[in-house]
Amino acid sequence: LKGIKVIDDFVTPFIDRTLSLSRDELEKLGKSDTEFTFLHSLANYTRDPKVIRDQLIAVLLAGRDTTAATLSWLMYELAHYPQTWQKLRAEVLEHVGPDRDPTYEDLKKLKYLNNALNETLRLYPAVPFNVRYALTDTTLPSCVSGHPDISVVKGDAVFYSTMAMQRRADLYPPTSADFAPVDVFSPERWEHWQPKPWQYVPFNGGPRICVGQNFALTEMAYVMVRIAQKYSRVEYRGDWHAQIHKVEIVGCPGNGVTVALFEDEK
């Protein structure tokens, strides 16, 4: 209860301030690229402060640790593969430049950066385990020769690991000069490979797919662009191979990711 009060004390003033705006004021803000916020959008749909609070908390909590963990894993890999960092940075400087604030359109055009994010989410999905409950009786076919099919009764909990699914070598093309082993970080694989349905599900899928998927990808791409604009080199501090995968709700680097960033010499 004490923690809930801290959260409420933080978000309530923002909600009250927004609800004090008239419909005309909200409509005027909606035409601005710089002043219109998610909170203003919510106020256009409901004037119920509890509903707005719940939506804000969902975004603040679900969009914090997941994004932070993914960016940490990306920096962990980039520090180990300097040539990948240089390639990513070159793309950013070519399409955005060293100083300009990237637009949403810029972020979508940065193919190598988006490939790097996809590759990070493939190896380290933010939520590596999940559960679904069967709505009807069904049977799952066995994938192992000689083993019986699996009966699933309505109401049964089905646990699955997105991390294990996305690292199954039998679901990928054979290793080659153009396709790195499945457990190796390689944004290049996305240049000539597209996963089959349900093979790549870092945001899950179906009616319960993560509603913040595009927001998260945009946020992470923006952060990486700003870092790449300023820093020419990334070095890992510590034993890269000693890293562990810590899993609670979110899967994150158990030892943290300590890196040194070197500014571009102008």
Model-predicted segments: where are they?
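Cytochrome P450
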Residues: 1-10, 46, 61, 105-115, ...
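Conserved cytochrome P450 catalytic core segment spanning the I/J/K helices
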Residues: 2-70, 187
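Cytochrome P450 I-helix active-site segment
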Residues: 27-35, 77-127, 134-136, 153-156, ...
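Short, small-residue alpha-helix embedded
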Residues: 66-79, 223
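Cytochrome P450 heme-binding "Cys pocket" and the immediately downstream C-terminal segment
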Residues: 82-84, 196, 209, 213-252
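Conserved cytochrome P450 K-helix/beta-meander segment immediately N-terminal to the heme-binding cysteine loop
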Residues: 160-193
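C-terminal helix/juxtamembrane-tail motif
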Residues: 252-266
